[in-house]
């Protein structure tokens, strides 16, 4: 709305005393002021109200000609809206203003003749042959998981582009039989490709592929009365599970990072649903959770909450990101919320069939709407999550 000092009472009367992202615009050619606040009315009164004495506080009363705002229902929504607003208003400098910390990822470089894994915070163009797994809380956590996991395989750790030469002396990993040593033709290209495929499947399944492989070998050894080998395989299996226990639930192949985040809404009797598609955050949609007696007329057949959620999500379009940088920024916002010690809202990820756990989603909607703490369930720990996926795939435990 338009603003002038003599209209401050009108502005302060309509501005909500709740969270919002706002833009203050001055005359033509001037730079807008963008910010977020947990109480928009109070912030505008400080920025646009009559200054008290010789205060050094920022006051834009005589410069602002127009005020815009978007009400938000949660800190996560405020952060997302602030990101979009700054990106629109300052396309060249918004990243410096936001200072987002990009999410650490495990990158499997598949377009190299001899693929390898590394840890990065950068995503290459979509045409590259790399696969990414994450987001991890820190680079140290990503490196530890990658190193502990690669100990179970014989894929190379070196970073050089290889030109295989039988005269090459190799490295400590080849000496310890922890690498197939393609650098000096210690294996054929086909053998190395098979090992890379095993690593790729391990990361994509959260370690379950290797668990199945070792369990099968252990059971075969026991059936053949080779109990010494079975015991060694069991110890190896426990080490794999220790590595898997490091894995937060949210860490997945980025293309499989799909789910639904539920946050409080600025709208009355509603929650905000944020669809997550391949780590990209869709615009929020409101879900009215008023009682049936309030929201449904006698002529309208009532819908279950599950059906209403599915109907709302079906109409949500995935965001069309124009660059890998935008993808990284969405992951940074998601990672920042997920790894907070104290956070508002709930996140539910899809299973290996692409389906949401709808019963838990419905319960989550109720908890967020009522402001209750999340109820502990399979989404709380990585170990339980991957055991759930193993159960769904028909994999028996010990």
Model-predicted regions and their roles:
Residues 1-398:
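Conserved catalytic/ligand-binding micro-motifs in nucleotide and anionic cofactor chemistry
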């Amino acid at each position: 709305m338009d603003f002038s000092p003599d209209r401050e009472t009108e502005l302060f009367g309509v501005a909500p005393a709740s969270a919002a992202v706002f833009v203050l615009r001055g005359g033509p050619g001037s730079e807008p002021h963008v910010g977020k606040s947990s109480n928009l009315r109070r912030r505008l009164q400080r920025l646009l109200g009559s200054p008290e004495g010789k205060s050094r506080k920022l006051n834009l009363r005589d410069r602002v000609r127009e005020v815009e705002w978007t009400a938000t229902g949660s800190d996560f929504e405020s952060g997302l809206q602030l990101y979009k607003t700054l990106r629109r208003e300052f396309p060249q400098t918004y990243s410096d203003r936001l200072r987002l910390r990009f999410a650490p990822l495990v990158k499997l470089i598949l377009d190299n003749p001899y693929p390898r894994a590394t840890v990065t915070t950068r995503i290459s163009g979509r045409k590259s042959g790399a696969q990414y797994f994450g987001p991890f809380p820190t680079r140290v956590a990503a490196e530890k998981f990658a190193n502990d996991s690669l100990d179970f395989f014989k894929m190379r750790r070196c970073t050089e582009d290889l030109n295989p030469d039988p005269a090459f002396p190799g490295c400590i990993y080849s000496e310890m039989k922890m690498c197939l040593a393609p650098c000096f033709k210690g294996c054929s290209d086909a053998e190395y490709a098979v090992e890379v495929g095993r690593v790729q499947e391990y990361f994509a399944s959260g370690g379950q592929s290797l668990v199945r492989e070792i369990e099968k070998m252990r059971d075969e050894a026991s059936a053949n009365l080779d109990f010494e080998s079975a015991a060694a395989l069991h110890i190896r299996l426990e080490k794999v599970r220790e590595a898997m226990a490091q894995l937060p639930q949210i860490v997945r192949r980025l293309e499989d990072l799909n789910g639904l985040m539920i946050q409080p809404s600025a709208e009355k009797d509603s929650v905000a649903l944020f669809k997550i598609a391949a780590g990209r955050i869709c615009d929020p949609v409101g879900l009215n959770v008023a009682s049936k007696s309030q929201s449904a007329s006698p002529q309208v057949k009532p819908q279950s909450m599950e059906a209403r959620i599915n109907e709302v999500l079906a109409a949500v379009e995935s965001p069309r990101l124009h660059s890998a940088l935008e993808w990284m920024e969405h992951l940074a916002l998601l990672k920042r919320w997920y790894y907070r010690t104290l956070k508002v809202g709930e996140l539910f990820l899809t299973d290996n069939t692409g389906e949401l756990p709808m019963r838990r989603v419905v319960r989550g909607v109720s908890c967020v709407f009522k402001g209750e703490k999340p109820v502990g369930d399979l989404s709380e720990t990585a170990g339980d999550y991957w055991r759930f996926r193993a159960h769904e795939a028909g994999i028996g435990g010990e």
